[in-house]
Amino acid sequence: MTVIDLVRQFAEDARTGVLVTDTDFSAAGPKILYANPAIGPLTGHSHTSLIGRSPKALQGKATSPFTRKAMGEALRAGRGFHTCLTNYRADGEAYLCEIDIRPLRNDEGEVEAFIAFERAVERRRVRARPGKNTRYRPVDPATEDEAVNEFSDFRPFQSPLD
């Protein structure tokens, strides 16, 4: 059983978008090896049409170059990365996306692929607090209800953003 087969077993019917990419960090960027169906409503692309493309295809003018650079550095070093950034849907609409990327390592500890958990978030307007700008709340794109972390044991979104 391959890594993709294992991920497919738990992610195929998940409401959170899941991507698996290779580790090629050439100029074109890593290639998507697997995308679950939940990525479709999030990005406006069918999950099958994303296979073989780079996640960079979802980025655009308002995607922070600083965040892209920091993400690339972390992934090239074999570390995970968690952030909110602006991505773009197939129709060109910008949306705020929370992404939690983790390396998938083999028995020798080498990174074989990366898995990314993605979800749209909305800004919640609140009074600013020292050290905090804005709080974010995950949103289920199908219902606009507050999303529930389906991978609670794995906790891919546990961070100061929660």
State where each predicted segment sits.
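Short hydrophobic secondary-structure edge segments in sensory/regulatory modules of signaling proteins
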Residues: 18-22
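PAS-family sensory domains
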Residues: 23-25, 86-92, 105-107
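Conserved hydrophobic beta-strand signature of PAS-family and PAS-like sensory domains
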Residues: 29-33
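PAS/PAS-like sensory domain cap-loop motif
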Residues: 39-50
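PAS-family sensory/regulatory domains
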Residues: 49-62
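Terminal output helix/cap of sensory domains in signal transduction proteins
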Residues: 61-86, 91-93, 148-153
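Short loop/turn elements at sensory-signaling interfaces that couple input to output
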Residues: 99-114, 119-129
